[in-house]
């Protein structure tokens, strides 16, 4: 095998081989142009059509378009009756919105460590984290792999807790044949640039519970009870926000939704090619898909086995050297999150709104502690991971997946020679 590109060898991935995501087709253009020629560009019929079509595709009774997945998460927390001082359990490793949505409604996040193999919340650690103030559990189907929902739902029903699915990355992922977003009490999806369903920006709130749907709709539009498509009385019946989606971007999302199943199939085909190519690579921990789960492969996230490489220094130093080596091969890998959630300043400072609120709220009790050392598996993952999104998606085929595999192999097989490693800690060649 040739030398890594970072050491002077040829690139595994030729320039121009990786295309932009998402692919744009004539139907997308037709929908968008038709919207531009309409009389309204705010929330309107295009949003309602996307709601109907997405609900049918995902198997939900109710769907509400939002301007982001973050907005949909806040709506979920509020609609589930979470209030001041309540506790909501959430994974210690995710995007910040998975936990800050709890603070948005004056409640307190309680973090739970991950299962290192799945990178998702460890269901076996959930029950120990429940307190008398716990009101809900947010499960994040991270990088497109579902959480073990049988275990989560059993715990939730035992303790009378609501379950919110953060499915922002998991469109089309399955758990024992059931789609994510259709197993808990409600769920949030994101449609931003990188997601498997892209409308530029935006999101979707979904539920099968009419009471929860009505509560979410109030939060969504100024505390009102009627949508902009109905005769509004412009009366705020509750505290509300403005989380509505505009009328243009849903048209793009509708066009993309017609190809979602095709996109997912392509990602799964390409990932199978890549996993076969990476079998037996020393020091590489590839992502898992347990029996009964169907991944959507939103983010192909790998970890590095430092012990297997003989590396005794800081894990992030070796991770960064390997990542830079793969980038030099033309493969756009990167770090997804540099900090676990409990280590982020907003939680360490416990001062979201000033004066220590909401942690200092008079309605709060059993104030959680956010010591990062309590979440060793999340920290280990954070320090050793790198991932990628677009190379395994449409319009790419097996040739791109094979080039990615070659890039990984070249770099891992020459890990001891990579630049950026201190000589005194550089692993010996096996």
Predicted regions and their residues:
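Basic phosphate/pyrophosphate-binding loop/patch that engages nucleotide-derived ligands
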Residues: 130, 154-162, 204-222, 316-317, ...
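Conserved PLP-binding active-site segment of the aspartate aminotransferase-like
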Residues: 287-291, 297-312, 332-354, 383-399
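PLP-dependent aminotransferase-like
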Residues: 78-167, 174
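Short glycine/proline-enriched loop/turn "hinge" motifs that connect secondary-structure elements
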Residues: 23-24, 240-244, 374-382
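Conserved PLP cofactor-binding pocket of PLP-dependent enzymes
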Residues: 223-232, 278, 319-387, 416-429
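Conserved PLP-binding active-site segment in aminotransferase class I/II-type PLP enzymes
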Residues: 1-75, 79, 83, 157, ...
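Active-site region of PLP-dependent enzymes
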Residues: 170-176, 183-302
């Amino acid at each position: 095998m040739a030398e890594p590109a970072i050491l002077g060898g040829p690139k595994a991935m030729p320039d121009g081989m990786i295309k932009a995501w998402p692919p744009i087709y004539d139907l997308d253009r037709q929908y968008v142009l038709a919207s531009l020629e309409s009389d309204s560009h705010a929330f309107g019929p295009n949003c309602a059509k996307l709601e109907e079509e997405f609900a049918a595709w995902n198997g939900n009774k109710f769907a509400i378009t939002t301007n982001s997945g973050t907005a949909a998460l806040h709506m979920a927390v509020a609609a589930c009756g979470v209030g001041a001082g309540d506790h909501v359990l959430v994974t210690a490793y995710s995007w910040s919105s998975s936990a800050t949505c709890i603070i948005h409604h004056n409640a307190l996040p309680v973090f739970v460590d991950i299962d290192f193999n799945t990178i998702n919340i460890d269901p076996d650690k959930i029950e120990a984290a429940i307190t008398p103030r716990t009101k809900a559990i947010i499960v994040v189907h991270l990088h497109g792999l579902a959480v073990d929902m049988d275990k989560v739902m059993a715990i939730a029903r035992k303790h009378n807790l609501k379950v919110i699915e953060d499915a922002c990355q998991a469109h089309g992922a399955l758990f024992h044949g059931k789609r994510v977003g259709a197993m808990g009490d409600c769920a949030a999806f994101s449609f931003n640039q990188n997601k498997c369903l892209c409308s530029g920006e935006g999101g979707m709130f979904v539920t099968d519970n009419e009471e929860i749907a009505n509560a979410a709709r109030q939060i969504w539009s100024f505390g009102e009870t009627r949508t902009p498509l109905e005769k509004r009385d412009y009366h705020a019946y509750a505290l509300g926000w403005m989380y509505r989606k505009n009328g243009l971007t849903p048209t793009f999302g509708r066009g993309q939704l017609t190809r979602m199943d095709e996109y997912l199939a392509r990602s799964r085909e390409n990932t199978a090619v890549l996993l076969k190519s990476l079998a037996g690579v020393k020091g590489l921990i590839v992502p898992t898909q347990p029996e009964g789960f169907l991944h959507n492969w939103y983010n192909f996230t790998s970890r590095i086995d430092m012990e297997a490489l003989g590396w005794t220094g800081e894990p992030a130093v070796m991770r960064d050297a390997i990542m830079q080596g793969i980038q030099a091969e033309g493969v756009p890998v990167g770090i997804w999150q540099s900090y676990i959630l409990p280590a982020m300043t907003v939680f360490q400072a416990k001062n979201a709104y000033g004066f220590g609120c909401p942690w200092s709220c008079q309605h709060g009790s059993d104030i959680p502690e956010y010591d990062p050392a309590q979440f060793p598996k999340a920290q280990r993952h954070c320090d050793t991971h790198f991932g990628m999104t677009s190379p395994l998606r449409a319009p790419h085929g097996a040739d791109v997946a094979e080039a990615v595999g070659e890039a990984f192999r070249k770099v891992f097989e020459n890990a001891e020679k990579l630049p950026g490693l201190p000589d005194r800690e550089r692993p010996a060649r096996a």
